[in-house]
A protein has these predicted regions:
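Short active-site segment of divalent metal-dependent hydrolases/proteases
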Residues: 12, 137-138
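Glycine-rich phosphate-binding loop signature in dinucleotide/nucleotide-binding domains
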Residues: 41-43, 123-127
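Internal catalytic-core helix/loop-beta-alpha segment
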Residues: 98-125
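Short beta-strand scaffold positions
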Residues: 49-50, 114, 132-133
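Generic beta-sheet signal
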Residues: 4, 126-136
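Active-site-proximal alpha-helix that buttresses catalytic centers in soluble enzyme cores
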Residues: 2-72, 94, 100, 104-107
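Active-site signature of alpha/beta-hydrolase-fold catalytic machinery across serine-
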Residues: 61, 140, 144
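Acidic, low-complexity terminal tails and accessory targeting/binding regions
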Residues: 38, 68-72, 78-90, 125, ...
């Protein structure tokens, strides 16, 4: 069974509108150090990341702690947006109401879901990996595993959150979220 810990990037500096170059805030860098301590105990065999700076900067200290490199993968980018949207919340609501909705040159929640699933299907069945990721992408996988809860999950997902997916024969068999207070994973499925 493959185990994938999807690590949402820590708090980004949203004053930087360039999606690829948006860095973490000082609070985000502190969140990353908390992740290093929380995830130190897990025997990861590989680290992957979206190539976006905020995801790479979140996962790299964890990979460094494990003595492993980070492999950037284009399949792991955040949902492609048509542009910087002043009405972001309205756009997001519409996308979660209709998983196929998007404005060009962006992409739909369903397209993000398919892209991420193709990455997961390519992992070895014995993989234990951590992935530097994004809120919409992670929530799209939750939606695939438990239809109807993706938007609610997205609306509650904090920065530097960890979502664990366990897959067997191409199916999500377990889904859990990291609970920092109890320092354990809470099972959703």
């Amino acid at each position: 069974m493959a185990t994938i810990d999807l690590v949402r990037h820590a708090e980004p500096d949203i004053t930087i509108h360039d999606d690829f170059l948006r860095p973490l805030t000082s609070a985000g860098r502190r969140q990353t150090q908390q992740l290093v301590a929380s995830l130190h105990q897990y025997p990861y065999t590989a680290f992957f990341s979206s190539p976006l700076k905020r995801a790479v900067d979140t996962i790299t200290p964890i990979a460094d702690d494990h003595g492993l490199p980070v492999q950037k993968n284009e399949l792991l980018v955040e949902r492609k947006m048509p542009a910087w949207l002043p009405n972001f919340s309205d756009y997001v609501n519409q996308q979660w109401q209709d998983l196929t909705f998007f404005e060009k040159p962006g992409e739909s929640i369903h397209q993000v879901q398919e892209r991420y699933l193709s990455f997961l299907y390519g992992l070895p069945s014995s993989a234990f990996v951590a992935v530097g990721s994004h809120g919409t992408a992670i929530s799209s996988l939750v939606e695939a595993a438990i239809p109807g809860i993706g938007y609610h999950f997205f609306s509650k997902l904090g920065y530097a959150a960890v979502t664990r997916i366990e897959m067997h024969a191409g199916n999500v068999v377990h889904l859990a979220v990291w609970e920092p207070k109890s320092k354990t994973f809470k099972v959703l499925k």
